């Protein structure tokens, strides 16, 4: 488990499970354009929607630099396990997506 930066009341597992630390409950993600997303309240009290793949990556491996995206290695946008995620450039991600469609 790792605390989500900027969201001290939440932890996230390597598999993408998000826990609310105030009540101990698991948050249920929703799907948007094939991606698993979750709404969290940040440390300033603002509610924000995030892709779970980005939260998993950043909580366990660090900040994603500008211009980079998180790719699902197996192409399954619902598989947010850390072992299935890698950082790629936007151009690399576009090539990977077009390759997977063939």
Regions found by a protein language model. Give the residues of each.
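Conserved recognition-core residues within compact binding domains
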Residues: 1-69, 74-102
């Amino acid at each position: 488990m790792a605390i989500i930066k900027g969201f001290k009341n939440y932890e996230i597992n390597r598999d993408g499970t998000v826990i609310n630390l105030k009540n101990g409950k698991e948050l249920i993600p929703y799907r948007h354009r094939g991606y698993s997303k979750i709404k969290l309240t940040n440390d300033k009290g603002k509610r924000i929607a995030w892709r779970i793949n980005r939260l998993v990556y950043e909580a366990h491996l660090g900040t994603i630099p500008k211009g980079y995206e998180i790719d699902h290695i197996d192409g399954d946008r619902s598989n947010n396990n850390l072992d299935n995620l890698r950082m790629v450039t936007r151009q690399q991600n576009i090539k990977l997506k077009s390759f997977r469609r063939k």
